[in-house]
Amino acid sequence: MKIGVVGLGDVGLSNAVLLALHNEVIGVDISQERVDALNNRKSPIIDQELSQFLADKQLNLSASTDLNASVKDADYVIISTPTDYNEKTNFFDTSLVQDIISKVIKTEPGACIVIKSTIPVGFIDEVRHSFETNAIIYSPEFLREGKALKDNLYPSRIVVGEKSERAKVFAGLLAEGANKQDIKLLFTGTREAEAIKLFSNTYLAMRVAFFNELDSYALAGEIDSKAIIEGVSLDPRIGNHYNNPSFGYGGYCLPKDTKQLLANYDTVPQNIIRAIVDANSTRKEFLANLILEKKPSKVGIFRLVMKAGSDNFRQSSIQGIMKRLKAKGIEVVVYEPELKKTTFFSSHVETDLTIFKVTVDIILSNRMVPDLDDVKAKVFTRDLFGQD
């Protein structure tokens, strides 16, 4: 089959590479740099497995900035472009997705359009009506940044928001490229699939918020947070995973997906969803105040990325603490080797790690890394288990 993949971020790239094992795939992106990298079998994002796959596997894969030429004669067109959360409208900005749908329908009306971008509940029904077509389906992704291809090769489940032959075919294409056997396939209605994505990420955010609030309680009471978490997590109903305290949940998906789900509730009574959103801000305020109590003159921010093995700066939790410290007049220095500029939010960006270490009084690091072992006394982190 011929498949077009529009948007070559974590989701689009991992899907394009997986599907190119057994199909002709053309990736589309507005970034010429990303297109050139993919055509040269280089990954434009940090993902070790993806880089290895591109180097070692025989893939029927090419990339282009020309959308119309790329989707011509395609059987499926996957849209995986960003849907940023608009704080003014309290909804995802789906304008880019809608623009691509419009262009694909005009160029290749026979293609089945599969939305992989995260969308609000009811979006598929809305665009089917506005574009007067049923050729649009939704298949949510459940990928981790930095491990997107691995999560496609070993998926927890494949969900498609339609009970139809074309939905089964698409799910089969994803399963065909995966290494995992006996993958759970789930075919639902469109709104159910949209809700599955938002509720999944909101549950993960809730778990992060829960263990962060446990950690805040332990810090305030000067008791052993690690011992409490270990004791709680030994209950098999709770589990010893996704329980490492942090500066808050961050990254591209969890902050915006929780807010979108809250907006989707509208007039439906709820308490937990609002509490999850609010808890993330409360955690950052609490930790910022702890740091301020130390009366530092200069605070260092070690990496802006969301987590180890990621190159994503978007909505990383450490930025929330950084902004709160700056609002109190604290001088901040940022160490971020992936940042190609000299300042970040009016703070100096230091590219020399040695200079960075001796310049600041306290180093904030969401996750502890070996690079900071020689200055452990300076490091402020809530990483208790050495994992994400």
Spans of features found by a protein language model:
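Structural/interface elements that position substrates and couple domains in central-metabolism enzymes
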Residues: 1-388
